[in-house]
Amino acid sequence: VYISPIRHAEGLLYLNAVLEKPELYEQMLSVLKDYDEDIISINYDNVNVTGRGVYKILSKSHKKALPLNVYGDGMKKAVLLMSAVIAAEDGVLLIDEFETAIHTSAMKNTFRWILETCRKLNVQVFVTSHSKEAIDKLLKCSEKCLDDMALYTLYKKENMTAVRRMNGRKAIEAQDNMGLELR
């Protein structure tokens, strides 16, 4: 499964995979409370003027369920990423610029859920980013996933591009204690 930096804006999701796994669905709703604290559920409504179905979010804040596309990009991106994890079970998930559209206040819980669920569902995930803040949140969101992480940075050495590989713990140490900027 591949997720581009703007895929959340295109409305293409993997929610059917989520709706078939009640435990993960409930966990996902819990994380989505960082985006809308009043969220109750997400469901598929196949009755639409265009003949196509839409995903709707029921929230205590609104009198009726609203289409996901009226929510902010952060909510859409979080739903996309979490549903993609489940759709990629026993496979590979590629996420380019994983942090786009996600507010920094919601990153920790969202990233923790993604990493821990990838581990549980046997999903190998590759993420790219240029955001120091997002990389820091990713590294520090789940202690139990640190040893499973590998972080690669590129740098110049004698007019050539070299690669540095570190596990999650070494990356945090390099960043916090040696001032290495990881992005």
Predicted segments, located by residue:
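Conserved hydrophobic alpha-helix in the ABC-type ATPase nucleotide-binding domain
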Residues: 110-114
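H-loop/switch region of ABC-family ATPase nucleotide-binding domains
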Residues: 128-130
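Phosphate-coordinating catalytic segments in nucleotide- and nucleic-acid-processing enzymes
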Residues: 1-80, 86, 92, 149-150, ...
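Short regulatory helix/loop adjacent to the ATP-binding pocket of P-loop NTPases
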Residues: 135-146
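ABC ATPase nucleotide-binding domain "signature" loop
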Residues: 100-104
